[in-house]
Amino acid sequence: MNLTLRVWRQQSANATGSFISYQAKDVTPDMSFLEMLDSLNEDLISRQEPPIAFDHDCREGICGTCGFLINGVAHGGQRGTTVCQLSMRFFKDGDTLTLEPWRARAFPIIRDLMVNRSAFDRIIQAGGFISAPTGSAPDANAILVRKEDADTAMDAAACIGCGACVAACPNASAMLFTSAKITHLNSLPQGQPQRDERTLSMVVAMRNELFGSCTNHGECEAVCPKHIPLEFIGKMNRDLIRALWHRHRQPLVIPSVVQLPSAEDSHEQLHDGVGAQPQEDVHQQRHEEVQAHVQAESPEPAATAPVSS
């Protein structure tokens, strides 16, 4: 079959890009989408034209390197399929396909369909690890893990960090990715000592990378090739509230001006509130204290030895 490809071509992050049309000829249904692009690139090179740049590595849907939009849908729209696994049998002769890179401020374009996803790496570096004493490997059965917790951790660990969730989200949110990485370790006994620190650090890192906020569209789950569920975002939010509470909780110290009236106080003084701070002022003061804590920077990670994978 023959296809028309409208491909986004851009030399660098600072260059001006545009769509350029190409003809992909003699495409067989047994080809993968990337094999079709390989064939097109060979034709471009033979004509001394620059080939189309795109990310790829394992081509087995494992590494998360590949990924771009096909007709506005991440990975082409086949449920649970990365673009490297996408078969050309899903397209028809004469189709026009529009290819463009992930669109997000946190993913600057490197060239053509390639984007810089190092923002994901920095989120993982902020807390995507566990720490343990160095030495010989512990017995495999020394720390028991419940079946439910192991299943949750395994489901979260399936995230390959391809970035489709960010590309599909109207706000370019990375909450599905971040929640998967947090839930993976927070679900295991080995991840409990640094659970609060991990959650706070990774959420702060995500915010600093200028990703958007989640507004419950659910587009991220719909395009995720590994079926990462939205419930992990809920788990992350609960862990974040838990971490903030543990970090900032302290006894509510009632200001000394708030006193119960003694027997000698007159009824007029009690009625007029003389000697007492209004209750709403106390609540407002406490609210401002908590807000100030929440806006503070997260603590530095503890200097511990990370476990090698």
Write out the residue ranges for each language-model feature:
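Eukaryote-biased recognition of intrinsically disordered, low-complexity regulatory segments
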Residues: M1-S21
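Ferredoxin-type iron-sulfur electron-transfer modules in oxidoreductases and energy-metabolism complexes
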Residues: M31-P50, L97-P278, R286, V290-H293, ...
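Short, structured protein-protein interaction patches enriched in aromatics and acidic/basic residues
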Residues: A53-T65
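Functionalized membrane-embedded alpha-helices
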Residues: I62, F68-I70, C220
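Glycine-rich phosphate/adenylate-binding loop and adjacent beta-alpha elements
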Residues: I70-G94, L99
